[in-house]
């Protein structure tokens, strides 16, 4: 006899499988199930007489049902998610798939695996990388602009190098100037000269006028006052003493040169250089009894150019006219060689 309880237990699994199967398969399944149920009801209605015949006809049907059930289970197994066929991923991980890149990286992210990254080893010195590593430029540039930029950068670099070289040359020149030859062929370094300010020089000169030699405590006090070292103050005083001593020794030499020069006011040099000539000099005569010898002896002309008895001076009567006719109370003709003389009354 056909087992109805086994059929009822099998129908829920078939119904669950039918929800996943396709519509055509569901239709075949329903027809087969309906046929089986109808056969079962018909066989139960016939009684025990038809039990043997129904069991013989149910064997092929069970085989077809089991084959259909195995087929549905195999298809259901293919739809179930497994670790090998399906991987659950989030939305950000699937974004690279839109651009044609694989979601899984092909290399390790461990920094210890690779060496240090040096951009200069892969790209040019002007900073322009490949298109696959950089974003497109918003302002496209031509090759000429790139060449100009590279030339300007090279020019700036060369200018900086030139400035550095010039500075180094100046430093070397200063060092060479600081070195001087002492005569033995060896270079001796000379210290650079220290320039004092006006205030420092004024204070040093003022102290030197009052005191030419300073003791060690006085040097230290003066150095602290004008912000110098005691050694600088000592050297300044030594140099200044030498300069003043040298200037004093030069002054007597100049005086000796002046004394050895010929005197321009001597009588002999004047007589030899200038011709003698008598010049009338106006003067006041108070006493009319003065003689010509006295006048000639006290004349400024004779004082300047020698004595009256000198052979260079001629006699007054040789070139002076007589003035006796012009002055009634004047002196004698011998003493009247002064034409512009005014006489006082006696």
Curated annotation (Swiss-Prot):
What PROSITE patterns does this protein map onto?
HOMEOBOX_1, HOMEOBOX_2
Instruction: Give its localization.
Output: Nucleus
Could you list this entry's UniProt keywords, alphabetically sorted. Answer: Developmental protein, DNA-binding, Homeobox, Nucleus
The molecular function GO annotations come to: DNA-binding transcription factor activity, RNA polymerase II-specific; RNA polymerase II cis-regulatory region sequence-specific DNA binding; sequence-specific DNA binding
Q: Where is this region: Disordered?
A: 1-68, 135-190
Residues in the DNA-binding region annotation:
189-248
SUPFAM superfamilies per UniProt? Homeodomain-like
Q: Where is the composition biased (Acidic residues)?
A: 166-182
Matching Gene3D superfamilies: Homeodomain-like
Which InterPro entries does the record associate with it? HD (IPR001356), HD_metazoa (IPR020479), Homeobox_CS (IPR017970), Homeobox_NK-like (IPR050394), Homeodomain-like_sf (IPR009057)
Domain of life, source organism: Eukaryota
Which first-to-last residue range defines the signal peptide? none
Question: Looking at the UniProt record for this protein, which Gene Ontology cellular component terms does it annotate, in alphabetical order?
Answer: nucleus
Query: Which residues lie in Polar residues bias regions?
Result: 25-44, 147-156
Q: What is its main location?
A: nucleus
**Biological process per Gene Ontology, one example term:** gonad morphogenesis
| Null mutant phenotype | RNAi-mediated knockdown in a bet-1 mutant background prevents the formation of extra distal tip cells (DTC) during gonad development.
Family, according to the entry, reads as follows: Belongs to the NK-2 homeobox family.
Any domain commentary?
Answer: The homeobox domain is required for the induction of distal tip cell fate.
Q: So what does this one do?
A: Involved in combinatorial activation of gene expression in pharyngeal muscle. Specifically binds a site necessary for activity of the B subelement of myo-2 enhancer.
UniProt-recorded name of the protein: Homeobox protein ceh-22
Origin species, per record, is Caenorhabditis elegans
Lineage of source species: Eukaryota, Metazoa, Ecdysozoa, Nematoda, Chromadorea
Gene name for this UniProt entry: ceh-22
């Amino acid at each position: 006899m056909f087992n109805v309880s086994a059929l009822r237990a099998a129908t829920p699994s078939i119904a669950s499988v039918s929800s996943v199967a396709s519509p055509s398969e569901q239709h075949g399944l329903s027809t087969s199930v309906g046929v089986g149920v109808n056969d079962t009801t018909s066989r139960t209605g016939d009684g025990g007489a038809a039990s043997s015949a129904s069991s013989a006809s149910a064997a092929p049907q069970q085989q077809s049902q089991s084959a259909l059930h195995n087929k549905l289970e195999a298809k259901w197994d293919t739809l179930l998610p497994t670790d090998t066929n399906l991987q659950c991923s989030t939305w950000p991980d699937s974004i690279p798939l839109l651009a044609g890149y694989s979601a899984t990286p092909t290399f390790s992210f461990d920094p210890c695996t690779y060496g240090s990254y040096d951009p200069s080893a892969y790209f040019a010195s002007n900073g322009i990388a490949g298109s696959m590593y950089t974003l497109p430029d918003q302002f496209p540039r031509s090759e000429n602009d790139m060449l100009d930029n590279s030339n300007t950068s090279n020019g700036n670099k060369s200018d900086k190098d030139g400035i550095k070289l010039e500075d180094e040359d100046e430093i070397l020149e200063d060092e060479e100037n600081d070195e001087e030859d002492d005569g033995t062929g060896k270079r001796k370094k000379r210290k650079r000269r220290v320039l004092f300010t006006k205030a420092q020089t004024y204070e040093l000169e003022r102290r030197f006028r009052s005191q030419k030699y300073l003791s060690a405590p006085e040097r230290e006090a003066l150095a602290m006052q004008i912000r110098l070292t005691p050694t600088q103050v000592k050297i300044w005083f030594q140099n200044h003493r030498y300069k003043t001593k040298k200037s004093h020794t030069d002054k007597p030499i100049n005086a000796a040169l002046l004394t050895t020069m010929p005197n321009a006011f001597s009588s002999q040099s004047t007589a030899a250089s200038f011709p003698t000539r008598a010049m009338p000099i106006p003067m006041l005569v108070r006493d009319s009894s003065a003689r010509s010898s006295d006048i000639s002896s006290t004349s400024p002309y004779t004082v300047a150019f020698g004595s009256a008895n000198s052979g260079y001076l001629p006699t007054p009567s040789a070139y002076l006219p007589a003035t006796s006719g012009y002055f009634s109370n004047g002196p004698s003709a011998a003493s009247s060689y002064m034409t512009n003389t005014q006489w006082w009354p006696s």
